[in-house]
Amino acid sequence: MNTRLVGSEMCIRDREGTDTNTSIGNYFSTMLDQSMNWKDAEKLCSQWGGHFALKGVMSVEDAKRAVDIGCTGIMVSNHGGRQLDGSRSPFDQLAEIVDAVGDKLDVICEGGIHRGTHMLKALSLGAKACSGGRLYLYALAAAGQAGVERALELYKSELVRDMKLMGCTKISDLNRNNLRFRR
């Protein structure tokens, strides 16, 4: 798959060797397969035979269903919800999902992680891990592997510094008492 800039729009060549171009917006709109269902996810999970994390969980109901089909992890993610004005962020959902299933599988906060303090907040809410794509991709595009390594160093140094400022010496010290919630 190739990308190129046509006018002011980024285009993706659909297949190698063809001249069919698709805008980035159209590509991501069409790659969302709404025919996938819970039976498909359960089949994938059972056939995988190992740890299996389901991405895109944004409700307690779906988190419980992921447990029921045998997932060992979930990624609380709104799949680029920045394109859906007013949608809840993974941070908004995280605490209630962790409360419901956090003792049964690993809850990973995916999305909205742009700095170490975001990781600190997600881990304090009970996430076992954090995931993010844009910072990694920006760093990769700007400086290759060295850029990604530097971005990860920045994440780590911010997290360690801010944990020290909070009086926490290890990740397991993080909890919701470390956070102040807006009312």
Where are these regions (language model features)?
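Single conserved hydrophobic/aromatic residue that forms the stacking wall/gate
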Residues: 1-7, 11-12
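Glycine-rich, proline-tolerant flexible connector loops at the mouths of alpha/beta enzymes
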Residues: 25, 78-88, 137-140
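Catalytic beta/alpha-barrel core
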Residues: 27-36, 51-58, 77, 85-86
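Active-site-adjacent beta->alpha loops and helix N-cap segments on the catalytic face
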Residues: 32-42, 60-64, 83-97, 144-146
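Glycine-rich beta-to-alpha transition loops that act as phosphate-gripper elements at the mouths
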Residues: 35, 54-60, 87, 105-119
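Conserved, mostly hydrophobic/aromatic
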Residues: 44, 66, 74, 122, ...
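Glycine-enriched alpha-helix->loop->beta-strand junction motifs that scaffold or abut catalytic
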Residues: 47-51, 67-81, 100-104, 126-130
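Alpha/beta catalytic cores of nucleotide-metabolism and tRNA/nucleoside-modifying enzymes
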Residues: 92-183
